[in-house]
């Protein structure tokens, strides 16, 4: 016991001695720390705040220089911290083009986001195909609006497996089942467009919103069939722009009441609730032996068949999806299609109306494939015969690609080129527009020339430049749907309506709102037309 006490006394004495030595002969580090504390004590709060701000500003510039490396971009951040935030609130197409022309790789920095833009075809393809290094990136608030459990946020094998379960929904055979109901929607909106023009005394009026509505109606009918009502379609079509506004590249990362993100979240929840109810009706329809007439039906049929299948892959890829899962997936289909298809519709009607020779060729082809029999209903074989109509659609997609850029986030340091490695956490954006306007592949790329897509032509053989729908593991699921739907839509409108576009100084100017639109919002008039004689009725 006494030995333990002696040890304690000795230990305490030793520590006391060390403490005294530290006081008598302080180390350099301790001296420096005390010096800094004394300095801070003598400073006012204002001076401390100003010093911290200066340190932050210097670090912001230093971090930018380190990440920028040798690629094109502003030498310094002209606006500290925020970068070109104010300019991004009103994006201009001309500024995008200037950025793409500045170099194969260029950069900007907005707040905490360092953004690298790739403007060449090969760099764009490399990024789109490098799922090991990158994954699709949406704005921070998208996770809250689309929901964290949504399949679009899956990565790697989980994403691949989920996607395989969806592939069967957008094959030509599946899409053929949706055509009869789509034709009914087209007929209804042709009558509506003619009526709107008549009520306006055939004076030019903006059709931007009507184009968004018809494309939303076509998409929702493809996805949900007759399970969704006309009122529900109209409500979603009217409010969907709130989702687009909420998911703009620059926005609040949190949801605050009565802001864009708040309204966007409300709209998304409303739409997904409708889709949940539709999913249950589709399950009931298939369980009762009904045939698929929409995407939900086809999905439920795959699940139903998988239950009785001996194929392991079928059971894995077509497990029993809940109504909530189906509703979230269908909302992402709408999210992926609505703005892009609305953009294509606006440009397609403007471009064709402004080129009477193109419109005449479309009408001639439409009569030929129907053998002048106007009772012929839309079907897959009919649409596949519309060679020129499809060339017009493809050239519109090249000439005015709805999607200019696709944002990705870097998962780990990514050697994008021999001279530059994109840092982890950076936003990496492959640009699609330059590849589609490459003069080495597309002669006179800024001219609209449908004939460039004749089979065997230089353009049709340049598969690597055709990036309208992306490439790699996240290539667009709905590209076949787009071509089929728009060939049917343009063919019917060309035959049964006489549509005219009023050209303004802003018609060929590009407005960027998620996708691209004519700046004057598309001034059109529609009149009823006899498809055989060409007679126009008022």
Swiss-Prot record:
Any one GO BP annotation for this protein: ergosterol biosynthetic process
Q: PROSITE patterns, per this entry?
A: CYTOCHROME_P450 (PS00086)
Q: Where is this cross-link: Glycyl lysine isopeptide (Lys-Gly) (interchain with G-Cter in ubiquitin)?
A: 164, 198
Pathway listed for it is:
Steroid metabolism; ergosterol biosynthesis; ergosterol from zymosterol: step 4/5
Topology with regard to the membrane?
Single-pass membrane protein
Respond yes or no to whether keyword 4Fe-4S is given for this record: no
Which cofactors is this protein said to need? Answer: heme
Question: Which keywords annotate this record?
Answer: Endoplasmic reticulum, Heme, Iron, Isopeptide bond, Lipid biosynthesis, Lipid metabolism, Membrane, Metal-binding, NADP, Oxidoreductase, Steroid biosynthesis, Steroid metabolism, Sterol biosynthesis, Sterol metabolism, Transmembrane, Transmembrane helix, Ubl conjugation
**InterPro entries in UniProt:** Cyt_P450 (IPR001128), Cyt_P450_CS (IPR017972), Cyt_P450_E_grp-IV (IPR002403), Cyt_P450_sf (IPR036396)
- Molecular function GO terms recorded: C-22 sterol desaturase (NADPH) activity; heme binding; iron ion binding; monooxygenase activity; oxidoreductase activity
Is the keyword Ubl conjugation assigned to this protein?
yes
Please tell me one Gene Ontology term that the record gives under cellular component. endoplasmic reticulum
Give the phenotype of cells or organisms lacking this gene: Abolishes the production of ergosterol.
Q: Which Pfam families match?
A: p450
Source domain of life is: Eukaryota
Its top-level enzyme class, in one word, is: oxidoreductase
Which segments cross the bilayer?
46-66
Q: Could you give the subunit structure recorded for this chain?
A: Interacts with ERG28.
What does this gene product do? The third module or late pathway involves the ergosterol synthesis itself through consecutive reactions that mainly occur in the endoplasmic reticulum (ER) membrane. Firstly, the squalene synthase ERG9 catalyzes the condensation of 2 farnesyl pyrophosphate moieties to form squalene, which is the precursor of all steroids.
The family database entries (PANTHER family) matched by this protein are listed as: C-22 STEROL DESATURASE ERG5, CYTOCHROME P450 26
The name this protein carries in UniProt is: C-22 sterol desaturase ERG5
- Organism equals Saccharomyces cerevisiae (strain ATCC 204508 / S288c)
Organism lineage reads as: Eukaryota, Fungi, Dikarya, Ascomycota, Saccharomycotina
């Amino acid at each position: 016991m006494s030995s333990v006490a002696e040890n304690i006394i000795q230990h305490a004495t030793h520590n006391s001695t060390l403490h005294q030595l530290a006081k008598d002969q302080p180390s350099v580090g301790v001296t420096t720390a005390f010096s800094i504390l004394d300095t801070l004590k003598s400073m006012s709060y204002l001076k401390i705040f100003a010093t911290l701000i200066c340190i932050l500003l210097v670090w912001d510039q230093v971090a930018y220089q380190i990440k920028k490396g040798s690629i094109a971009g502003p030498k310094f951040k002209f606006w500290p911290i925020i970068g070109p935030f104010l300019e991004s609130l009103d994006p201009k197409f001309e500024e995008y083009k200037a950025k793409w022309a500045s170099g194969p790789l260029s950069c900007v920095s907005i707040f905490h986001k360092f953004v690298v833009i790739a403007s060449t075809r090969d760099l764009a393809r490399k990024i789109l195909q490098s799922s090991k290094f990158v994954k699709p990136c949406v704005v921070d608030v998208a996770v809250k609006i689309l929901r964290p459990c949504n399949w679009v946020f899956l990565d790697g094998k989980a994403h691949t497996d989920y996607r395989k379960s969806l592939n069967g929904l957008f094959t030509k055979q599946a899409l053929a089942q949706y055509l009869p109901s789509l034709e009914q929607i087209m007929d209804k909106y042709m009558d509506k467009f003619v009526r709107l023009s008549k009520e306006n005394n055939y004076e030019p009026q903006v059709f931007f919103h009507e184009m968004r509505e018809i494309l939303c109606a076509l998409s929702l009918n493809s996805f949900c069939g007759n399970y969704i009502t006309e009122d529900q379609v109209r409500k979603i079509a009217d409010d969907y722009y709130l989702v687009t506004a909420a998911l703009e590249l620059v926005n609040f990362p949190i949801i605050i009441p009565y802001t864009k993100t708040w309204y966007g979240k409300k709209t998304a929840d409303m739409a997904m609730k409708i889709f949940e109810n539709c999913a249950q009706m589709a399950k009931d329809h298939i369980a009762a032996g009904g045939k698929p007439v929409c995407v939900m039906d086809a999905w439920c049929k795959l699940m139903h068949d998988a239950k009785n299948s001996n194929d392991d892959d079928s059971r894995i890829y077509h497990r029993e999806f809940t109504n909530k899962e189906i509703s979230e997936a269908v909302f992402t289909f709408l999210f992926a299609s609505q703005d892009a298809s609305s953009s294509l519709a606006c440009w397609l009607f403007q471009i064709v109306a402004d080129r009477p020779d193109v419109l005449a060729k479309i009408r001639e082809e439409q009569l030929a494939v129907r053998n002048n029999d106007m009772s012929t209903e839309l079907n897959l074989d009919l649409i596949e015969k519309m060679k020129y109509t499809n060339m017009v659609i493809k050239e519109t997609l090249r000439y005015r690609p709805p999607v200019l850029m696709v944002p990705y986030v870097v998962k780990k340091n990514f050697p994008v080129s021999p001279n530059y490695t994109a840092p982890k956490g950076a936003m990496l954006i492959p640009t699609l527009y330059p590849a589609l306007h490459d003069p080495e592949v597309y002669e006179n790329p800024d001219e609209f020339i449908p004939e460039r897509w004749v089979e065997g032509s230089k353009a049709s053989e340049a598969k690597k430049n055709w990036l309208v729908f992306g490439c790699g593991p996240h290539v667009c699921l709905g590209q076949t749907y787009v071509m089929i739907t728009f060939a049917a839509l343009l063919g019917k409108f060309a035959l049964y309506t006489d549509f005219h576009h009023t050209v303004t100084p802003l018609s060929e100017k590009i407005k960027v709102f998620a996708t691209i639109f004519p700046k004057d919002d598309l001034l059109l008039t529609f009149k009823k037309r006899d498809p055989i004689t060409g007679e126009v009725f008022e």
